[in-house]
Curated annotation (Swiss-Prot):
The keyword rRNA processing applies. Pfam families: SpoU_methylase, SpoU_sub_bind. It is an enzyme of class 2 (transferase). It catalyses: guanosine(2251) in 23S rRNA + S-adenosyl-L-methionine = 2'-O-methylguanosine(2251) in 23S rRNA + S-adenosyl-L-homocysteine + H(+). Keywords: Cytoplasm, Methyltransferase, rRNA processing, S-adenosyl-L-methionine, Transferase. This is 23S rRNA (guanosine-2'-O-)-methyltransferase RlmB. The gene is rlmB. The lineage of its organism: Bacteria, Pseudomonadati, Pseudomonadota, Gammaproteobacteria, Vibrionales. Disulfide bonds: none annotated. Its EC number is 2.1.1.185. Belongs to the class IV-like SAM-binding methyltransferase superfamily. RNA methyltransferase TrmH family. RlmB subfamily.
Amino acid sequence: MSNDMIFGIHAVKAVLATDPVRLIEVFVLKDRQDDRLMPLLTELKDLGITIQHAGRKALDDKAKGASHQGIIARVKPAKQLNEHDLDTILEGSENPLLLILDGVTDPHNLGACLRNADAAGAVAVIIPKDRAAQLTATASKVACGAAEVMPLVRVTNLARTMRALQDKGVWIVGTAGEATHDIYHSKLTGPLAIVMGAEGEGMRRLTRETCDDLIKIPMAGSVSSLNVSVATGICLFEAVRQRQI
């Protein structure tokens, strides 16, 4: 993660709950009294984590303009996951739901997609190592804690990884405006990976050709597309709905 910094109450709480050894020190807005913040600071103190109080300008400088809610933590880098970790992830789920992002380069969108994936119960988010947003502090802040708990798998060859998933029985559906049927008339149950492409460009050709099926979100108004994080949430939760029937 860029600068090994995480911003905001949710992100710090998530690291504290899941991997507290990553926490090095925490910077808190001086004289801030907050019902959400005080219990968190107590937990951090109990673990012996250094807490430094700083003025707003100092925190703003550390956050480089990003919203920080008065708390910033310096952390050790999280473990980097790759295609070799997918076997372990899949073995831990009988009916896995995965999200694949192809060409999503905006950290805000990555963070929002991670949050959507966590809320929908996905077991992992897969992105290519190249032509993809990195897990910056901004992405982590937007993810609202999900970046610290959702496995983010970076792969060298996305199409090859998709074929490996298919060999393990994962059905892969890609979203495309020219698809012949929509998400509400598509089977989204069973082991499943949903592929979302970049806004405007969509999925790359090889990614599209590797999908088992193409689906679309029906659009009733004048706009032709949705923000990728919004579209991701719609697709993931339609899969969640179908799995509960």
